[in-house]
Amino acid sequence: MEYNYTHGGDVYRNPIEYDFSINVNPLGMPLASIQAAHEGIVLTGRYPDYRAEQLCRAIAKAQNIPADRIIPGNGAAELLYALGQTIPGTALAIAPTFTGYAEAVAAGGGEMSYAGCEDADGRAADMDGQDKLQFESETVIQRLLAKLDDSICLVFLCNPNNPTGTLFTREQILRVLAKAEAMQAYVCVDECFLPFLEEEASHSMLPYLTKHTRLLVLRAFTKIYCMAGLRLGYLACGDTELQSRIRAKLQPWNTSIPAQLAGIAALSDTEYLAKTRENLQAERAYLVPRLRELVAEVYDGYGNFLLFRDEPDLKERMLEVGVLIRACGDFEGLDDTYFRIGIRSHSENQEFIRRLVRVKGDTKWQNQS
């Protein structure tokens, strides 16, 4: 049976020049991490530290959390799958959100329930009566709380949410956590995109880890440090007993020596994060108004990506001009008129607009950069 791959980044079967389907850092992997990974290759004749203790200590220092609460993994995906196997049953997530949660839950034999929008099409009327998805954070949290009952064993909350860009406050997440604790459910907050934001320090749930045993926080080097091909992530766990059960689902030596060394090097490069956030702010300001002139609707949230609506065949038409974008019809609550692009470097974003103009036949932006 053929594997049904629905995520972005499939450049291997799509001959393209520009990949806007993934949300990795356009600055590329930090130079120190590249050098560390090269040094790690020389050491690959030995087994990696199966505990990844040096990496865990580096993460603990950077995030001010106990090193013994950190579970390293071969990217966030491996940790999600281990979590799905450890806590089988019914999980709850907002809709739309990252499709990997449902895949991990299904692989563990569980079921996914969604707190979606108000009608069957995933749309609700806004204050002006227009047909529009409701992505505002408090609206989403209210729907999630209404759906959370004692049938739920695990709640996933992506912050900021992929693909909508909705950013949730600590107060909102703590309300979800309080109800989940009362229902004996766990809450996994996915913060893989949070380091892209200046708001990281005020929105991360990592400081609450030791106070709430039902809290888990998922992070990855994949997106923020552009290590998608190297694979490195971690799950911070408030419950030490649950942590042991999750570890039991993982293979030994699941993080390579090059990945461990690259991760340690990345955490020491604070200038890289500052440059990343500066680039994102500038390029979001460049892309949003231009996209709004060319597509049906743009949802300007947080994170290094943009969700928008247009004609269903836009992905195929963009492939014809050498650009891969993420079609979002497989996201719960969205249809084939929704698309997502990663926010790239300025030159790449300029080229994206030029090629979108070519596809749309719109000359308004033809001579603008």
Which stretches of residues belong to each language-model region?
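N-terminal "arm"/small-domain region of PLP-dependent enzymes with the aminotransferase-like
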Residues: 1-46, 128, 367-368
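PLP-dependent aminotransferase class I/II
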Residues: 29-30, 214-298
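Short loop-beta-helix segment that forms the pyridoxal 5′-phosphate
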Residues: 48, 60-82
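Conserved PLP-anchoring active-site segment centered on the Schiff-base-forming lysine
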Residues: 84-106, 111, 117-118, 132
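Helix C-cap/helix->beta junction micro-motif
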Residues: 108, 182-183, 212, 294
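Active-site phosphate-binding strand-loop segment of PLP-dependent enzymes
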Residues: 120-197
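Conserved PLP-binding catalytic core of the aspartate aminotransferase-like
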Residues: 281, 293-322
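PLP-dependent enzyme catalytic core of the Aspartate aminotransferase-like
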Residues: 320, 330-369
